[in-house]
């Protein structure tokens, strides 16, 4: 029996939608399987996505050459994706990275500054006085130093980027199947996907791109080897006037000596409810999940009170001029691979591949990561394109 499709992508998040677009641009017979965003998280019993949000930091500088290449190649295509889809998702407001000044035990700022020079990226290096003069709304610890990237950096809306990628995949001929995959198997010379809705779909090859939910016990013959952590993010509502006053605020990564108080923060962003929120994240410790059931239950919550209290304190220390705004929290998740890089490779079957384990830092790089996943299916391997890592996939015994 002939397969229903040439290639199926399982997962309609940032990586899956990107892979579907790149595949559909190059061949016919593409499908992407995954449910829509639930209307009510608290009562939803299915899977979730970490892209249900409006703010992720994007920047081109990274001390790691491979991560820098993934980011730069993705960012270079933002304008094309926005133009072709008609959906805007990128705000080039710049990105500021701060930490203890160079010369001490913490070398984070030094590594970022060196990476910027190596990559030829224009930056401003700011000491205490420079930080205060350029960003008066921030209050940093004495002895801080910052690397400011004014261009090619800022933030993206993951929700709108996924919408844009999905639209372009459909325009190129991909079929969107709004169902939830339960299992992927190599059967009789085909890759077969069975869904929770009771249907089966077959293809020459299948690419799994379901983020943290890829740890589901029966999804693959052997589950992927990665650690999945719950994260709590906190949102502070600001008025129109406050948002205007903070219009010069860049995306921020603040690194502290002991790392416990290290955070990331997004400037005021308008959310679907019409209000502006400043988002901050950076849990004080890890909350690991061993099963998909635990992960589903986590996404139905609003996160942890412990993390919220931690982030509220840091927010008021960093932005003292915003006086006790209303706030709320939400849950998210990140997945870490053994290698520290995305896993883009085949299972024991040459018909079933994975695109998972994005290490909490891949939203900005999702288009290039998705392209590499598409290349894996089309060419049978990732071609040598300047990456030092082989993006190898790991599986549990």
Predicted region positions:
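N-terminal Rossmann-like FAD-binding beta1-loop-alpha1 element of flavoenzymes
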Residues: 5-32
């Amino acid at each position: 029996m002939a397969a229903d499709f040439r290639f199926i992508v399982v997962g309609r998040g940032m990586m899956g939608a990107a892979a579907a677009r790149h595949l559909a641009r190059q061949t016919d017979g593409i499908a992407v399987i995954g449910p829509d965003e639930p209307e009510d998280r608290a009562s939803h019993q299915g899977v979730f996505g970490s892209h249900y949000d409006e703010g992720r930091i994007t920047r081109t500088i990274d001390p790691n050459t491979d991560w820098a290449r993934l980011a730069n190649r993705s960012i270079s295509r933002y304008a094309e994706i926005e133009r072709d889809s008609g959906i805007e998702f990128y705000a080039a407001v710049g990105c500021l990275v701060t930490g203890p000044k160079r010369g001490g035990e913490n070398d984070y700022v030094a590594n970022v500054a060196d990476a910027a020079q190596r990559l030829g990226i224009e930056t401003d290096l700011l000491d205490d006085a420079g930080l205060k003069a350029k960003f008066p709304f921030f209050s940093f610890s004495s002895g801080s130093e910052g690397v400011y990237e004014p261009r090619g950096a800022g933030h993206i809306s993951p929700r709108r980027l996924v919408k844009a990628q999905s639209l372009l995949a459909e325009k190129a001929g991909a079929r969107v199947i709004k169902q939830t995959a339960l299992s992927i198997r190599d059967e009789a010379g085909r890759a077969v996907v069975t869904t929770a809705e009771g249907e089966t779909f077959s293809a020459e090859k299948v690419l799994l791109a379901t983020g943290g939910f890829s740890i589901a016990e029966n999804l693959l013959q052997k589950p992927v080897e990665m650690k999945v952590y719950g994260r709590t993010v906190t949102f502070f509502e600001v008025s129109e006037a406050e948002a205007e006053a903070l219009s010069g605020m860049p995306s921020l990564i603040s690194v502290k000596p002991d790392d416990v108080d290290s955070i990331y923060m997004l400037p005021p962003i308008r959310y679907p409810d019409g209000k502006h929120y400043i988002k901050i994240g950076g849990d004080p410790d890890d909350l690991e999940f061993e099963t998909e059931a635990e992960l589903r239950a986590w996404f139905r919550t609003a996160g942890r009170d412990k993390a919220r209290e931690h982030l509220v304190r840091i927010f008021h220390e960093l932005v003292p001029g915003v006086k006790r705004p209303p706030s709320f929290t939400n849950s998210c998740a990140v997945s870490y691979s053994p290698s520290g890089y995305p896993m883009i490779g085949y299972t024991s079957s040459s018909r079933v591949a994975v695109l998972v384990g994005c290490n909490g830092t891949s939203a900005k790089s999702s288009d290039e990561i998705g392209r590499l996943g598409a290349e894996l299916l089309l060419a049978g391997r990732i071609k040598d394109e300047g990456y030092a890592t082989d993006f190898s996939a790991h599986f549990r015994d």
